[in-house]
């Protein structure tokens, strides 16, 4: 117990996001949450299947599927159109290419997963909604606003442009610089 407590306290002191330029995490107070252990899916290796829905303002666009994740060298991935479950693995490149060796059947709870992804992603220009399926029911994993810290190289340029075209950003708000000395640096002339 003492060793676990030490490890958790050490983890809580780390500034999550510092090394990956994910500054949006800095304002969040770190917490440890203990959850019930979800059973693994023996038909697909040593872990649950992780369904990662890339969503754009409430619209699930595609789903990256990951399983067998206990060892990085054994990870398997797949890429599917979120609505039709058509395999779109031809868009996979780079680090995922060698891992793209699976054909995962359509999850029994896909319609409920899509409904959950729609509701959870509504109002966000882009967010990844991660879900699992346990006993035919969707289970929430997490919301991810910067997949792979914004440095994911696992998709082709064409697919990145297709996903990027799904984003509709609100008009930028003009604000005064937060540092008064910065105003002089921004003036021209």
Pin down the residues of each PLM region:
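Short secondary-structure junctions and interdomain/linker hinges
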Residues: 15, 41, 124-128, 170
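Alpha-helical structural motif
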Residues: 4, 113-116, 155, 159
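Phosphate-binding site of ATP-dependent enzymes
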Residues: 2-94
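A long amphipathic alpha-helix within ATP-dependent nucleotide-binding catalytic cores
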Residues: 22-37, 78-138
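Catalytic cores of PAPS-dependent sulfotransferases
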Residues: 47, 52-73, 108-126, 131-140, ...
């Amino acid at each position: 117990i003492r060793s676990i407590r030490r490890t958790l306290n050490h983890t809580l002191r780390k500034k999550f996001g510092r090394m990956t330029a994910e500054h949006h995490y800095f304002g969040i107070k770190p917490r440890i949450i203990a959850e019930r252990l979800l059973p693994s899916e023996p038909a697909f290796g040593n872990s649950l299947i992780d369904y990662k829905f890339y969503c754009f303002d409430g619209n699930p666009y595609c789903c990256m599927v990951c399983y067998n994740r206990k060892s990085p060298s054994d990870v398997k991935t797949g890429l599917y159109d979120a609505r039709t479950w058509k395999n779109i693995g031809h868009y996979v490149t780079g680090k995922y290419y060698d891992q793209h060796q699976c054909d995962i059947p359509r999850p029994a709870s896909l319609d409920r997963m899509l409904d959950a992804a729609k509701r959870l992603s509504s109002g966000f220009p882009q967010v990844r909604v991660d879900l699992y399926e346990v006993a035919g029911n969707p289970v929430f994993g997490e919301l991810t606003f910067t997949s792979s810290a914004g440095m994911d190289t696992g998709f082709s340029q064409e697919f990145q442009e297709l996903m990027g075209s799904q984003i509709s950003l609100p008009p930028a708000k003009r604000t005064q610089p937060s540092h008064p000395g910065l105003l002089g640096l921004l003036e021209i002339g």
